[in-house]
């Protein structure tokens, strides 16, 4: 009985890396995608439209971050998403809700593009160390 328990534990150790939700390949793919998003987002509209994808990558990456990294980015996201107003109405649906509408007032474009650039920079730093 003791040897079968040891064998089961050994098998679980071999299988457990295959069951992880965010693999090294996923991490590398997200790293490349962040670089591509930042490189291709040249104008304000493309930056604003790409912000949600950066937030989606952050959500996938979240469980693998240290508490300090999570707190830093969460604080940044919370501060800025509370201030973003689309068509004169504040965002709704939580701190990481979709923040980009079809029409963003010109006064908010600077804030939204600054948010994109800073979030992209913070996420890129997580991958480069």
UniProtKB/Swiss-Prot annotation:
Predominant location: secreted
Glycosylation sites: 49
InterPro entries found in the cross-reference section: Turandot (IPR010825)
Keywords: Antibiotic, Antimicrobial, Glycoprotein, Immunity, Innate immunity, Secreted, Signal
Tissue: Expressed in the fat body (at protein level).
Induction profile: By stressful conditions such as bacterial infection, heat shock, mechanical pressure, dehydration, feeding with oxidative agents such as paraquat or exposure to ultraviolet light.
Job description of the protein: A humoral factor that plays a role in stress tolerance; gives increased resistance to the lethal effects of bacterial challenge and stress. Regulated by the JAK/STAT pathway and NF-KB-like Relish pathway in the fat body, upd3 in the hemocytes and Mekk1 in response to septic injury and consequent immune response.
Keyword Signal: yes
Cell location: Secreted
GO cellular component terms attached to this protein's record: extracellular space
Note: Flies overexpressing TotA show prolonged survival and retain normal activity at otherwise lethal temperatures.
This protein's name: Protein Turandot A
Domain of life: Eukaryota
A UniProt-annotated Pfam family: Turandot
Family note: Belongs to the Turandot family.
GO biological-process terms attached to the record: cellular response to heat; cellular response to mechanical stimulus; cellular response to oxidative stress; cellular response to UV; defense response to bacterium; innate immune response; response to bacterium; response to cold
Segment forming the signal sequence: 1-21
